[in-house]
């Protein structure tokens, strides 16, 4: 239950290099905010079985869920996508696509999280 909490959502899928490339930086983000009331959710259109198999081999510290491809593309036409949802459930910021320098995603998300913390 994420009601009343800041939520960072990542839309991704297993077979897309830019999604995989940013995972170490997203893990760093989770580590940085581990003592704060901020939640991290990764949503993929891959099956639960495929996600679990992938996570057995690759560390990705977000909580995980599976959604339909059409629902994912209703939110973001390009992966990866990142949404910052405030404690009132309002989408406050969106990053669509991966930066050319993947490590920049960490700084961009930190800036948005800090801006939206209450």
What spans do the regions from the language model cover?
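Hydrophobic beta-strand anchors of alpha/beta hydrolase catalytic cores
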Residues: 8-9, 40, 82
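Non-globular targeting/processing and membrane-anchoring segments
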Residues: 115-118
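Conserved redox-active cysteine motifs that mediate thiol-disulfide chemistry
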Residues: 3, 11-28
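A short beta-strand-turn-helix
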Residues: 1-7, 33
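Structural microenvironment flanking redox-active thiols in thiol-disulfide oxidoreductases
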Residues: 20-59, 66-73
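Thiol/disulfide oxidoreductase modules built on the thioredoxin-like
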Residues: 53-60, 66-112
């Amino acid at each position: 239950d994420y009601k009343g909490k800041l939520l960072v959502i990542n839309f991704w899928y297993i077979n897309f290099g830019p999604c995989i490339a940013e995972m170490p930086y997203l893990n760093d983000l989770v580590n940085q905010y581990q003592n704060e009331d901020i939640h991290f959710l990764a949503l993929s259109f891959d099956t639960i079985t495929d996600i679990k198999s992938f996570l057995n081999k690759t560390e990705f510290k977000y909580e995980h869920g599976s959604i339909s491809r059409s629902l994912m593309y209703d939110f973001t036409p390009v992966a990866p996508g990142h949404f910052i949802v405030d404690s009132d459930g309002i989408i406050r910021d969106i990053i669509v696509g991966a930066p050319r320098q993947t490590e920049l995603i960490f700084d961009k998300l930190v800036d948005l999280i800090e801006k939206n913390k209450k």
